[in-house]
Amino acid sequence: MDFIRMIEEEQMKKDLPAFRPGDTVRVHVKVVEGTRERIQAFEGVVIKMKGGGLRRTFTVRRVTYGVGVERTFPLHSPRIDRIEVIRRGIVRRAKLYYLRELSGKAARIRDRR
């Protein structure tokens, strides 16, 4: 068991910012198109964090042209270039699935000071 934990710790990223559900983040993802590789930003609200250790994932939601888009990222993925925390939000839940049903001003999240 120690051997598996040791290998996982080697592959974990150390330079990740602290964020939690309710925070607005910008995730810079490496995208491969043919032979070229570029970085694409995905900005939205973190609605869920799941798992632990190397298997930890988080889901980011944003609304684009009236359509809600959710994307789930492995936290320690080599495809993630960097994560920026734009705003910190106050929420009382760990999973913010209720935001899927809300739109406009009702979907706002208060700022943490």
From Swiss-Prot:
Keywords: Ribonucleoprotein, Ribosomal protein
Gene Ontology MF: a single term: structural constituent of ribosome
GO cellular component, one term: cytosolic large ribosomal subunit
Keyword match Ribonucleoprotein: yes
Pfam families: Ribosomal_L19
Source taxon at top rank: Bacteria
GO BP terms in the entry: translation
Family: Belongs to the bacterial ribosomal protein bL19 family.
Function description: This protein is located at the 30S-50S ribosomal subunit interface and may play a role in the structure and function of the aminoacyl-tRNA binding site.
PANTHER family associated with the record: LARGE RIBOSOMAL SUBUNIT PROTEIN BL19M, RIBOSOMAL PROTEIN L19
Protein name (Swiss-Prot/TrEMBL): Large ribosomal subunit protein bL19
